[in-house]
């Protein structure tokens, strides 16, 4: 890919609620995780670098397919049970690595479709990842705020990203 795993992972962490740490798995012999073949297989369904899917999985689960987060997200891709149900998958099925990754990609594709007005491919990835992380409703709210305050609702950096942070401030609502 055109970006190294560390660079891609750092960018995903920057979009995440959690602070970026240097605690990134070491890439050994070109392998990031035992699930690399599954990331490669399912990345084709969204047209993304498989390392970006691996980055999401590392952030969501540290590559543990049976983990349940503090918020209740399950599996390698950190899918919420209601999201899984909406995609026809039970929370138990998310523990299967292939199903978990496929469901994560289905979820990402749905979020991406929600940003059809964003034409720049890199911007669309940023918005899609942000929606995956924070929920699409929060991103739509931040876009409305960006528009209201004269920023570009279709640009992430220094535009919509600022309003994600300010959304909790009633002065901006």
Regions from the language model: what does each represent?
Residues 1-15:
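Extended ligand-binding regions for polar small-molecule ligands
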Residues 12, 18-173:
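Catalytic glycan-binding domains that act on GlcNAc-containing polysaccharides
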